Amino acid sequence: MTCDNPSVWKAKMLLTCKIALISALGVILAALSANTYADDMVVNAKNSLEWNRKEAFYHAIGNAEAIQGKQKIRAESLKAFYDPETVERTITRIVADGNASFADENHNGSGQKLDYDARKETYVLNGPAAVISGPDGSGAAEKTIIFKRAAQIVELVKDAEIKLKDGRHLSGQEITIYHDETNNILRIAAAGNVTITQADGSKATANKADYNRAADSALLTGNVIVKDRETELAGDRAEVDFATGISKMLSDKSGGRVSGRFTRLKE
């Protein structure tokens, strides 16, 4: 079944999902203001809407968007899959293609493609140049960004980078961000050519890094180099206290040594 513009699909997500087709914007706005439709999902498009009963999905084409409460998904093409076994036709997944983006009350992100699992409350953004932002800063990845809303975890894969609002940058091949219940960063774990750059320009590099937001400190492991201007420390492990500015270089368990190179005093 195909519907040409103007037209709108309404689908209530999860247990209370209902499907309706509304053809006038004024009716949509009136419906959205009523408590009856408070949890409904509204899907609209510029060009057309298709209902594929065989494969159980609705297809919005041309500047498509899906809106439910404070959640919004946009793309050139959008497919909303539903569970055909339920009378309510519960929406279980949304696949968006072409300049895809999402936004909720705390985060927004974009990529070439987007896949949202409604039951797991998980967004998958595919690159190149996928990005996501939240209360503490923004992140980017060349391949994939996975945002697990229920677990409050963000995973960035390949050429990943985080820019925090306090001026710090962190990059690596893989970065995992853990949020607290207020959507602020609690912990960051990074692996693969990790670089941490401070607001003052000092840098630390390592194979892996684990940043503790509450303690404002990081544990760096594997080929660690901490550099501040002409001062450089090298070793297998390092503890960096960002609050005090103290960096402690530690040797590995095999008996390796740590080293330091310092600016020569002026004569």
Region spans (language model):
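Mature-chain termini and adjacent capping regions
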Residues: 1-267
